[in-house]
From Swiss-Prot:
Membrane topology: Single-pass membrane protein
Domain of life: Eukaryota
Protein name per Swiss-Prot or TrEMBL: Cytochrome c oxidase subunit 6C-2
Single GO biological process annotation from the record: oxidative phosphorylation
Organism, as annotated: Thunnus obesus (Bigeye tuna)
Pathway(s) per entry: Energy metabolism; oxidative phosphorylation
Intracellular or extracellular location(s): Mitochondrion inner membrane
UniProt keyword annotations, A-Z: Membrane, Mitochondrion, Mitochondrion inner membrane
Length: 15
């Protein structure tokens, strides 16, 4: 999910 980029969260959120 690209949510990590928008929410500025760690890359772990990508999985």
């Amino acid at each position: 999910k690209m949510l990590g980029v928008v929410a500025k969260k760690p890359m772990s959120d990508y999985e």
